[in-house]
A protein has these predicted regions:
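HEAT-repeat alpha-solenoid elements in large eukaryotic scaffold proteins
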Residues: 41-52, 78-91
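Long alpha-helical HEAT/HEAT-like repeat alpha-solenoid scaffolds in very large eukaryotic proteins
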Residues: 143-166
Length: 166
């Protein structure tokens, strides 16, 4: 009987290991595709980028893998001088629903609000505005910005979410 139990456990361990390897390969594939697309794309306000279309399609196949890939890219490029890739990650997060990017998306948005680049800080606040979720109100209310323009913008987003948020 013990041999049967050991055999079942070994088979189970092999299946888990195989699943983890498959998931890691899928996440890595998502990361490579997204990173290459972000690097080659232009993100213009009001226009749908090629990468936005790609991320939405990928999201249908594996939300967790896409979020993991975006977090990897975010962490890898957070401290880079050239903010193009970081800006791309933020743009992609902005087109995905608040609930679907939880909690990684919100964590990334909070992180960029302490970035040294002013444009990136604004994009972090803007993410909460674009997500249009009342759940974001309590998070934004806890923030304090040194620069008055960001504090005012955050307060405007809070007012907007209180009035029109879902």
């Amino acid at each position: 009987m013990q041999d049967d139990d050991d055999s079942i456990l070994q088979d189970s361990d092999l299946q888990v290991s195989y699943f983890q390897e498959e998931r890691e390969a899928f996440v890595n594939n998502c990361k490579v595709q997204l990173l290459n697309s972000i690097i080659g794309d232009e993100f213009i306000d009001g226009e749908i980028s090629r990468t936005e279309i790609i991320v939405k399609e990928m999201f249908k196949r594996g939300r967790e893998a896409v979020m993991s890939a975006l977090m990897d890219i975010y962490l890898e490029y957070f401290s880079e001088q050239d903010i193009h890739v970081l800006k791309g990650v933020l743009e992609l997060l902005s087109v995905l629903p608040y609930e679907d990017v939880r909690p990684s998306g919100q964590i990334m948005a909070l992180g960029v609000m302490r970035h040294k680049n002013k444009y990136v800080i604004k994009k972090g606040i803007q993410l909460y505005e674009r997500w249009n979720s009342k759940e974001g109100i309590k998070i934004i209310k806890t923030l304090h910005f040194e620069e008055m323009r960001f504090q005012k913008y955050a307060e405007q987003v809070i007012e907007y979410l209180e009035r029109d948020g879902v």
